[in-house]
Amino acid sequence: MFANNVMFDYSKEPSRDILCIDCKSFYASVEAVERGLDPLTTKLVVMSYYDEAGGQSRGSGLILASSPAAKKAFNISNVTRARDLPYPYPDDLVIAQPRMRVYMEKNQEINRIYKSYVDEANHHVFSVDESFLDVTDSFKLFKVSSAYEMAQKIQKDVYDQTGIYTTIGIGDNPFLAKVALDIGAKKEGDMIAEWRYEDVPDTLWQIADLTEVCGIGHRMARRLKGMGINNVYDLAHSSYYVLKDKLGVMGAQLYAHSWGVDRSFLGTPYTTKDKSIGNSQVLPRDYTDKDEIAVVVKEMADQIGTRLRRAGAQTQVVGLGLGYSMGYFDTSGKRGIHKQVKVTPTNQSKVIAEVALYLLSLLYDDQVIRHISLYSGNLVYHQAIQLNLFESENNQVADMKTDVIVDTIRKKYGFKSLVYASSLKAGGRAIDRSSLVGGHAGGMAGIEGEAHG
């Protein structure tokens, strides 16, 4: 240990009872339960572009989710190619087409169970299959004596009501709960792991692969290894001041995390005051490629344009928000960043996309992105069309006509019947995730009757 290094007094750090709950192989589990099958023992994959009525025809898309048994039997992971499966397909392999709306409905059902244990302020949805709960103040109400007992109770409730298995990490703070889930829970027979401050030397410091820790990507791991830091123990016993000097606020945060310290609290999400129409996506993985992020932003702009036109509205403000991966902080110590600009009233998808991509160029600087939000605000509702004085009148009218044609086709044949070619690129979400409901995975929120803002 370095002389005069920063030390932490756990007695002065936040100590709550935080649960990080993950629905095990969520999409695949939902499909198994819908078929009356066991989610753990059934070999099942969710595959895009697979014709279930086509017998042994080979799928050509992505494997979006795999059951635990399928992963083990075929040595595959989530988000692999159809060609990675043995062909002809084994008789005991179940292949399901993705049904995002079904998954979102099941997600909402499960989150209602969570909310029966905690209030809104103590419930945070991290992704479609993962949530944080602060159950510190819920023990007496549910007549339990520990966070572990509470976790067992919630786990049983979710399974009894939905048939979905959950894994749970318990910690004094969100970070410890998250790493307990990611690393500890999957090794336990009851799929629950509890990591407390006093357990750090025997749990957190035993992690050999830095990239297993949320907030440390491969690029950061390489930088740390260049500094002689090869595992979490090395990180905890390195110089705080050297880390801070070389990596800025991120270095300070990594040092704190290596000691299991996280001073963040669960809270309610930010909502804009002005009436707005927007979309918010929790991405299926960390995005670090600007081009991939741009594809998603453009898709979301297209969705918002459609929703504005359906509502008979025009926006005077376009805003973009980028949320970072769990545990990631930028050089300013922030967990996310957002920016908005005023625009001439519009509901044209092309204009909204151009503004959104401009905002992306201002905001993105190699951060690790897990959440994207795009919104339109200060809406005006009237029949008159306001043209931009600095652009060709003919071009603007032509773009409006194009939007009307696109809307007509999508209304009849579905949103993904007509999408940008860029949606076929890596990172695209509009096709494989064709129903953006509740802020995750798709592209139809507000277009087929929903109004998620």
What kind of feature is each model-predicted range?
Residues V30, K334-G453:
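Acidic, metal-coordinating catalytic segment for phosphate/diphosphate chemistry
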Residues V128-S131, Q314-F329, Y375-A384:
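Core structural elements
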Residues V128-V135, D172-A177:
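Short, conserved phosphate-binding/catalytic loop or strand-edge motifs used
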